Amino acid sequence: MALVRVSCMLALLLIAGQGQAAPVKTEGSTLGLLGGGFGGSVGLSAGIGVGGGLYSGFGGGGYPGGYASGYPGGYGGGYSGYNGYGGSGFGGGYYPGGGYSGFGHRPHHHGGYYPGGGSYHNQGGSYGGHYSQSQYSNGYYGGGGYGGGGYGGNGFFGK
């Protein structure tokens, strides 16, 4: 008799447990999906919208902080002073965008390991200064979609 009681209680607990757990799980999944969607949208708009255009020097991006002021702007972003000023800001880094690159100045101020400032994607310094003062490296795209822009950085919008 006691065994029947125990098994009945266990069955009731299992049924009750299932009834309660289902909505919580569903809600969690829904919230997770919403959160993921929102996070993805924010990442894309920060990375592509803000980072990739005229204001790329001020942009944040998909990979904020630490290791990237931009993809191959290298590891300059996290370790430089003012990432908002394009590429790697003032401080340099492994592949710094260097100096005031976001405002059209020469990219060699405060170099880094590649003291030309922009061996990658600023197209300056080590690569002979191609486009080094044009809108494609140090002007509108200074540090550009790839440096402090689309792929990361701690720009003013990336904080």
Swiss-Prot record:
It comes from the Eukaryota. Larval (posterior) and imaginal (anterior) epidermis. Residues 1-21 form the signal peptide. Transmembrane segments: none annotated. Keywords: Cuticle, Signal. GO terms for molecular function: structural constituent of pupal chitin-based cuticle. Component of the pupal cuticle. This protein is glycine-rich and contains several repeats of the motif (G/S)1-4(Y/F) like structural proteins from insect egg shells, egg cases and vertebrate cytokeratins. This is Pupal cuticle protein Edg-91. It comes from Drosophila melanogaster (Fruit fly).
